[in-house]
Structures are given as C-alpha cells and as structure tokens.
Amino acid sequence: MKVAISACLLGLPVRYDGGAKPVSAVQKLAEKVNVTKICPETSSGLPVPRPPAEQREGRVWLKDGSDVTDDFERGSKIALNAVTSSDITLAVLKAKSPSCGVHEIYDGTYSGKLVSGEGTLTRHLLEEGICVVTEKTIENVRPSVEHPVALILGTGLGHLADLVKPVRRIDYRDIPGFPVDASPMAGHSFEATIGTIDGVPVVVYPGRVHLYQGYSAAEVTSLVQHAHHLGCKDIIFAGATGAVSGNAKTGLGVITDQINLTGTNPLAEWAGLRDVETPFVDMNDAFSPYLRTLARGVADDLKIELNEGVFAGLLGPNFETPAEVAMLRSFGVSYVGVSTALEVIMARALDMNVLALTLAANPAGAHGTTHKSVQEASEKYANDLERLVRGVLGLL
C-alpha cells in the first residue's frame, strides 16, 4: 500500500525551527507500507529554520509579518503532485499545521489557540478524494493488549475465529446484557475468544443475535458494549448481505455509510446503557475513512476485488421483496441485511473506530435465496476475507 507521510513525523528535521516531530506509531506504519515523504513548506523553498507560520483570514503569515501564502500554495501543489502521480490514496499529515492540519489549525495569533480549518495541502488532497488523517488517528487506532481489536462476525464468517491464538475464552452467557437463553443459529457460535491474530491483540465474537429473534436493541448490541468494556477502540464487523442490483454486485465489499430501517435504536433504551455519555451521537464518518482506506489498500495489494457502498439495516427475517429492492436502489443503497446497523450506532456512541466488511452473498430479493445458500456463498469467499482481515490487522 502506498502512503504519503509528513517528513517531520518520520524524524526528518524539516520543521520551521529545524526540528522534527517523530511519532512512533507513524514510524511503525511506515515500516509496513510504501512511503512517499512530503513537506510542502520545504518543497516551496522556504528556509529552515524560519519564523513560525499560521493561517489568518485565508492567508498564511510568518510571525515576523511576512505573507508566505504563495510559498505555501506552491509547496502544497508540489506535494500534491507527488501524491497524485503515485496513485496514493492515504496521507498522514502533521496535526494543526498551516499546511497539513486536518479539521483544526492554529488561529493566526501564535498563542496556541485552535480554530476549525484545513491546511493548504490538506485542502488540495481532500479535493482529490484522498483520505487525510493526522498522527493522532494513527496513534488512536493502534491496538495493544490493553486495547485489542474487536471482530464481530455474522453468518458463515465465524471461521475467522480459527485464526486466533487463544489466551482466554468467554461464554456469551457470561457477557452482561447478552440474553442467556439465546441459542446460536447455523453458522454462528456463542463463545468469544481473546488472543492474537498474527501477533495483533484481538477479541473475536463469532456470532450474534438479531432483532427478528425477539431480542431488544440493547441485547443485540451487548457484544459491542462488552468489547468496549474490554478496552477495544477499534471494531471490525463482518456479515453477509444481499447486493442491491444496479448499485452493487455479489462479493466482498466495505460499507461506507448506513441507513437504519429496523424501526428501533439502541440509544433509545437509555436507562440500560453503560459508558455512553450522550444519546445524541454524531454519525458523520460513522465508518472510519482511515480504516476503509486501509481495507481498500490491502485489497489492491492482494488483488482482491473489494466493492463499496451504503448499507441498509432491516428488521427481517424474510428476504426482501422486489418492491423493497427497488426502493432501496432509489435510496442509493448497495447492501442490505438484518444486522450491523444497530451495532454501528452503539460503537459510535462509545467512540469506537468502525470498519464494516460485507460479503454480498446473493442479489437482494433473488429467487431461491435461503439461509443455507448464504452460508455456501460465504464459504466461496472465505479465503479472500481471511486475507483481507489479516492484512488490515497487520497495518494497525
């Protein structure tokens, strides 16, 4: 995978004061990917050292009063060309910088105060559709024994649990909030495994319960709350779906957004929630752009076809009618299923980083679709899904 990274984060002395800002998590990522080092400020020809620069009223000023907007724009376009000419889809830039800041930058008073805004290079990269994050994102998603990655698996995908080098197993009946009388459906197992996959700490849940079985939204999302309680900050959902013809085709995909059509919401059951600060959760970028970009990069490297699109969560358990499929198509939906939607809402309420992978096992509403045929289709893509998940975990 190709990644552009701010040179200062890799330890190069290119900052205005002649120093660097090396970040261990970024350096570890750089060891696993094909890196293009960028620094728009030095690319512009600005000297090192120099006075600090900040944006103010749409211009970039040095602390000595010099207007260096044109220099920053020139350097940003040089860096942009280095990124686009190499077909790079991910850039890791220095937070708060007037050239590389993402969502917030210094306000131009040189007092350390931050305001909403983007660096000059960041704006250009975003316009090109490139995923831009700062070192804070890389540090936040880095797994550890204290912060393992959670994987919640759906029909026919529980085989991923076999990859785990186990340390401990947890019966679902011992998980707070999970229905003790529940029995796993075919293709599911109700025993979580704590351990590692290729050395990466994980907690794998190879089965779940659903609303259509009569369980509440709180019970359906109890595994997410349990993962959060165990310290998980990153969570990967993998489940079988139907592909909405015209918007998606069968095979592996990554979910970019969702529509909750289940008729309920776990945050509406406020009295039973643990660890959630507010039910009024921002669902913009509910599916981490960074994790999605990693998944696409891994898929490209491994030559795995990986589509993407919007997911619609329905109540089920019946498969979709032709009229429902037509409606979903008009909504811009690519994938439809009976899980994931509520779990993603809960994960975001708990401030977890979400990646949702899907196996579109059948065309939505197709004649002859059965639970068994979905399981059989899952087996067809089992190897590619395994390679994809292992590849993503390896980059965290």
Regions found by a protein language model. Name each.
Residues 364-396:
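His/Asp/Glu-rich mid-to-C-terminal helical/loop segments that flank catalytic regions of hydrolases
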Residues 43, 53-78, 82, 113-141, ...:
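Divalent-metal-activated hydrolytic enzyme cores
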Residues 21-62:
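Short, surface-exposed acidic-centric catalytic microdomains
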Residues 58, 139-283:
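Metabolite-binding pocket within alpha/beta catalytic cores that recognizes anionic/polar moieties
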Residues 19-36, 118-122, 165-186:
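Short catalytic helix/loop segments, enriched in acidic residues and glycine
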Residues 8-13, 60-68, 106, 201-215, ...:
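Short, basic, glycine/proline-bearing loop/turn elements
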